[in-house]
């Protein structure tokens, strides 16, 4: 390994670290700064931009943001709330099932924010330690991203692997069952995590603290949201678009044919989701300003800018040193290709973006000759958000759990989400790798 490669690699890592600390569009712009150093300073030729990935994400975000502005996300949250309140005794299993399903349908984990107070309230009122369902609900909302046909990370994987004959249906046949089974197995363990609520010393202290008297006396923590007919229509249209994406991904023969080949999946997703966004705007007439002010639009555009900068930076470095990198990791790729999961996990911890992680490392995995079944099997490893407790829903859950059972420990990493996250990761990876070798 040359000193020049190590120096340039250190620059890339520094840009990722600083960009992640800055937050917002930090990853993207610091990726651009790193690219300026590599190109102007070291003379590296910039790699090709991940245009297809960026455009697919923008198309999906446009449709999802229109749905949110039309009240569709509120409607989905209302349904989720009803499900949680009807099954209080099994909330450690029901809560993650709800956040997993609604993240899969919406392509974003933002639904978790709104159901967390419901989970906290229902579990406390039924004497269940809120830490258990809260932690698994947050983890499930992350892991469901790899199972959603309209999530940024999934459309990116499809774009990279389609030249190898891998279609959307192939990816989902692995990620959907592996995340369902993996999360369920993790729930079995987490259901016994920590002391029972009635025996928890912090909760008992708060019960006797006058400051918490009004909070614990309250029986409602979320107001009922009125849902309009147009909100329901927007959800129906959005889910119809998602279904079309799945069908055309699973059956390329139903796509238009040009020069003897079916239309590429990138263009298919872009056309379908932009059209769905247009239909939502025409039929539901949401406020045009609200579309671009919503949380879905902001998060989606941040992901696009992150991929623009960081993925471009990483690809530029790897293309310049691909021969050296291949030689360096050749033995590892041949003997333990699954070890690529560690790289995905570590980068996802740093960048807090599944889409950016895929766009940065999947081209490297393909260039190194890692088989597509292995790449799909370890895809779930892009969900390392939980390792450092700075992810939005993690912070939110600490505030919503008034019992104090959901917490960050003295040493930062000994937090409520570490064990649920590691268990979920282990089981999902194990099942995902097994399924990918059987199915693909």
Curated annotation (Swiss-Prot):
Membrane-spanning ranges: 1-21, 22-42, 47-67, 91-111, 138-158, 171-191, 233-253, 262-282, 303-323, 331-351, 362-382, 419-439
Reactions that this protein is recorded to catalyse: fumarate(in) + succinate(out) = fumarate(out) + succinate(in); (S)-malate(in) + succinate(out) = (S)-malate(out) + succinate(in); L-aspartate(in) + succinate(out) = L-aspartate(out) + succinate(in); (S,S)-tartrate(out) + succinate(in) = (S,S)-tartrate(in) + succinate(out)
Disulphide-bridged cysteine pairs: none
InterPro entries listed in its UniProt record: Anaer_Dcu_memb_transpt
Keywords: Antiport, Cell inner membrane, Cell membrane, Membrane, Transmembrane, Transmembrane helix, Transport
Pfam families to which the protein is assigned, alphabetical: DcuA_DcuB
Topology within the bilayer: Multi-pass membrane protein
Subcellular location, record wording: Cell inner membrane
Any one cellular-component term (Gene Ontology): plasma membrane
Molecular-function annotations in GO: antiporter activity; C4-dicarboxylate transmembrane transporter activity
PANTHER family tied to this protein: ANAEROBIC C4-DICARBOXYLATE TRANSPORTER DCUB
Family: Belongs to the DcuA/DcuB transporter (TC 2.A.13.1) family.
Function of the protein: Responsible for the transport of C4-dicarboxylates during anaerobic growth. Catalyzes the uptake of fumarate, malate, aspartate or D-tartrate coupled to the export of succinate. May function primarily as a C4-dicarboxylate transporter during fumarate respiration. Required for anaerobic growth on D-tartrate.
Name the record gives this protein: Anaerobic C4-dicarboxylate transporter DcuB
Organism whose genome encodes this protein: Haemophilus influenzae (strain ATCC 51907 / DSM 11121 / KW20 / Rd)
Upper taxonomic lineage: Bacteria, Pseudomonadati, Pseudomonadota, Gammaproteobacteria, Pasteurellales
Gene of this entry: dcuB
